[in-house]
Design a protein with these regions (language model features):
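Alpha-helical transmembrane segments in inner-membrane proteins
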Residues: 1-331
């Protein structure tokens, strides 16, 4: 009993440390930039009734909403990845690797290129695309059950197929691709309060439903036979939680574009620290995902100033080697 209490206390301590780290990273991100600001200016901006000086305008209209978007995107992608890893019984599952992000991406590109006046419906259309891609992967991988190797193969195939659709649109509509190209790279430039307002409901609903399903995901991760023996409706749980993962991924992709490896790397890092209990893994993944995206975006924005490196490139640079490490370790 003492050991269980110590383990629980340790996990709660990790969550608290992550909360503090996210807040600290956002404060540092507000300070750093081409125009540095002080802590006193940040405090004044947060409580001022009017934004009268340049520093306040930079903090409130540019850096703060961008930080919030980065945190929400990171949380959504990380939790989506954690869910997919349980649902698909594969530690290498990730919204991008298994084609979910590609489905959302294709749907988004269709709107950006063919219906540019309807960009306000991108989140909804991206969700439909993400859900369709997830179901396609699941259907292709099903043969008397789902095996991890088939999930990866089906995901790669679906991602390649949907990626070819994106490429075809970019080729046939070359005169309209500027906005779509910037979106596909995965970046947070020019993100402000309107994007926060669009993303927040998706993130809130998705994260709440994810946490409500945490116990079921923990049971599901034990294996189908064990889960059925414990009374879990396995396929129903898979379908519902796949919907939740698609909602989170679609919300993130619709705002930030195609950012890979967050859903792969973050849950694994947390799993090494706090174990496989999804009651702690999901909130921990959300916080660590937020932390990593805020830090990565800050590095991309500040390190090579005045050139801004999209956060999608930063994540791919560090995430790809980690993915290869996981492949070698699992083999």
């Amino acid at each position: 009993m003492d050991s269980l209490n110590e383990r629980k206390l340790f996990r709660i301590s990790v969550i608290i440390i992550l909360v503090i780290a996210v807040i600290a990273s956002m404060i540092i991100s507000l300070i750093w930039g081409s125009t540095p600001v002080s802590l006193s200016e940040i405090w004044h901006t947060l409580w001022a009734s009017e934004l009268t000086d340049t520093a306040s305008q930079i903090i409130w209209n540019i850096r703060l909403p961008r930080n919030i978007v980065a945190a929400l995107v990171g949380a959504c992608l990380a939790v989506s990845g954690a869910i997919l890893q349980a649902v698909m019984k594969n530690p290498l599952a990730d919204p991008q690797i298994v084609g979910v992000s590609s489905g959302a991406g294709l749907a988004g590109v269709i709107i950006f290129i063919l219906f540019p006046g309807y960009d306000h419906i991108v989140p909804l259309v991206a969700f439909i695309g993400a859900m369709a891609a997830a179901l396609m992967v699941y259907a292709l991988a099903w043969k008397n059950g789902v095996r991890p190797s088939r999930i990866i193969l089906a995901g790669v195939a679906v991602a390649a197929f949907l990626g070819s659709g994106i490429s075809a649109l970019l080729v046939f509509y070359g005169d309209r691709v500027q906005g779509a190209l910037l979106w596909m790279v995965g970046g947070l430039a020019a993100r402000s309060w309107p994007q926060v307002e669009v993303l927040f409901p998706y993130a809130l609903v998705g994260l709440i439903f994810a946490c409500l399903g945490a116990k079921r995901l923990t049971i599901l991760s034990l294996g189908d036979e064990t889960a059925k023996g414990l009374g879990l409706k396995v396929e129903q749980t898979r379908l519902i939680m796949t919907d939740v993962a698609a909602l989170l991924a679609a919300g993130a992709v619709s705002i930030a574009g195609l950012i890979g490896f967050v859903g792969l790397v973050i849950p694994h890092m947390l799993r090494l620290i706090i174990g496989n209990d999804y009651a702690y893994l999901l909130p921990g993944s959300a916080l660590l995902g937020a932390l990593v995206l805020v830090v990565s975006d800050t590095v991309g924005r500040v390190m090579w100033s005045p050139i801004e490196v999209p956060v999608g490139i930063i994540m791919a640079f560090f995430g790809a080697p980690f993915f290869l490490y996981l492949l070698r370790r699992d083999n």
